Amino acid sequence: FAEVGELIVPLTYRVMEKAVQQLHQWQAEGFRTTVACNLSPRLLMDDDLPRHLEGFLTHYQVDPASLELEITETALIAEPERAREILLRIHAMGVRLSIDDFGTGYSSLALLKRLPLHALKIDLLFVSQMLHSEQDAVIVSSTVNLAHNLGLSIVAEGVENAGIQAALRELGCDEAQGYHIGRPMTVEEIKIWLAADHWLPAGGWAGPSHYVATA
């Protein structure tokens, strides 16, 4: 509803500010944390986005590298050059940028060399079935290799069990998210979870230990 109405831009700015504020609080309490926010396609067309973002980071004294913005491939379709210019300005601040749900949109691979990206997030559509589908396993493996060869990190979505986690570890996947790693939590639950180091699985392969998606 918000996406098709007029609420999505102010709502996303509000969520983004709250995320930066929460990030400041967690880091002040000693947690090594990165927060990721989904970026609305409409907000990606807002020329004021870099200014607002810089204001939030400055006001709450947060290192820009501690914030990551997730962009869907579809969000880049309407005006790719305009979106690219805005993302370049955000990248210049030091904010991390990632493509969310990689492999399910309509964009070209050419975007990977034109955008200032830090990471790809491979969609759960492929990850959740990789133990049962040879095609999905090949797609996941190829995407991991593609990201690494381009100097990007890779995040796997939809890690629902230990088998998938082990397979991703074997492929060299950098980070993971899903119910096997951690279910949605409140702010206080996240603090307890991080303090207990539940994110460190046996074998030394870490999921998104410092990576908390917020919106």
Regions found by a protein language model. Name each.
Residues R169, M185-V212:
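C-terminal helical cap(s) of enzyme catalytic domains, especially alpha/beta-barrels
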Residues T12, A83, D136, V140:
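Short, conserved glycine- and acidic-residue-centered signature motifs
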Residues V35, P41, R51-M130, L146, ...:
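The catalytic core of metal-dependent phosphodiesterases that act on cyclic dinucleotides
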Residues S40-D46:
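Glycine-rich phosphate-binding loops at beta-strand->alpha-helix junctions
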Residues A2-I8, I77, M130-Q135:
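Short, contiguous acidic/charged loop-to-helix segments that flank catalytic cores in large enzymes
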Residues F1-V4, P10-L39, G55-S66, M93:
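Helix C-cap/alpha-to-beta connector motif
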